[in-house]
């Protein structure tokens, strides 16, 4: 589960390495986020020469969580880390590469570009 003040690793090459969650989008009473949720975050660590800088406020989509997710076929998947991919306002990724596996649940949303860039979809 992702909530306010959670720190997530960034799974793309946009220049950010770690982000801190400011808000989970999707209504006024949303307290926690899971895979596929869009968040507003600030960049806490960044690599030099990247697209985004430290302190920038960005939008991101959660692609991996330690908490995991239940699937309709009865299986359960969880990851070793919490990670997100930075996105633009049109839900396209800011980076050109995605690192690490992502969950299949992103396929049904508006994130097919992220799914196609990912090296592994679980």
Swiss-Prot record:
GO CC annotation, single: cytosolic large ribosomal subunit
PROSITE patterns: RIBOSOMAL_L14
Keyword check for GTP-binding: no
MF terms (GO), sorted A to Z: large ribosomal subunit rRNA binding; structural constituent of ribosome
Keyword line: Ribonucleoprotein, Ribosomal protein, RNA-binding, rRNA-binding
Bilayer-spanning residue ranges: none
HAMAP family referenced in this protein's UniProt entry, alphabetically: Ribosomal_uL14
The family this protein is said to belong to: Belongs to the universal ribosomal protein uL14 family.
Name of protein: Large ribosomal subunit protein uL14
Name of the coding gene: rplN
């Amino acid at each position: 589960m992702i909530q306010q003040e959670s720190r997530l690793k960034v799974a793309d090459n946009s220049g950010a390495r770690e982000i801190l969650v400011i808000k989970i989008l999707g209504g006024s009473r949303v307290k926690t986020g899971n895979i596929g949720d869009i968040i507003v975050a600030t960049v806490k660590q960044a690599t030099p020469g990247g697209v985004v800088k430290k302190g920038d406020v960005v939008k991101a989509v959660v692609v991996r969580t330690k908490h995991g997710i239940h699937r309709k076929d009865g299986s359960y998947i969880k990851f070793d880390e919490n990670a997100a991919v930075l996105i633009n306002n049109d839900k396209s990724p800011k980076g050109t590469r995605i690192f690490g596996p992502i969950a299949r649940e992103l396929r049904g949303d508006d994130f097919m570009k992220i799914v196609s860039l990912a090296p592994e979809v679980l």
